[in-house]
Amino acid sequence: MQKISTIEEFEQVVRDNSRFIFLKHSTTCPISGAGYDAFSAFASSQKEVPAYYLHVQEARPLSNYIAETYNVKHESPQALFFEEGKVKWHASHWKISEDELAKQIAK
């Protein structure tokens, strides 16, 4: 799992990966902590898709860029599955789970 902080880094991830998962994580929210734990556990349990994340407090411009560019309302925590440069699926709060991530990746 790799931390991304800038728009340039994110654009490189999109160029380099046909599929990847991404998490917007708030370091001050307990629900976000639970989402981060589930996302991290899933990321470390599989090698099919690379996993990236950002800390909302440290990378607000990137978080806003993703919301605006991909037309996905910002939430935190928020997991996104990108495929071929588009958001194929996203979920927030308690809907982020290892099982749900696995289900979406398998589609």
Ranges and model annotations:
Residues 70-83:
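Structural micro-motif
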Residues 12-45:
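Local sequence-structure signature of Cys/Sec-based thiol-disulfide redox active-site neighborhoods
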Residues 81-107:
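Non-catalytic, surface beta->alpha helical segment in thiol-disulfide oxidoreductase systems
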Residues 48-63:
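Thiol-based oxidoreductase modules, predominantly thioredoxin-like and allied folds used
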Residues 1-11:
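N-terminal "domain-start" segment that seeds a small globular fold
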Residues 9, 35-42, 54, 68, ...:
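A structural signal for the main folded, soluble domain(s) of proteins
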Residues 44-49, 100-102:
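Short cysteine/histidine-rich metal-coordination sites, predominantly Zn2+-binding motifs
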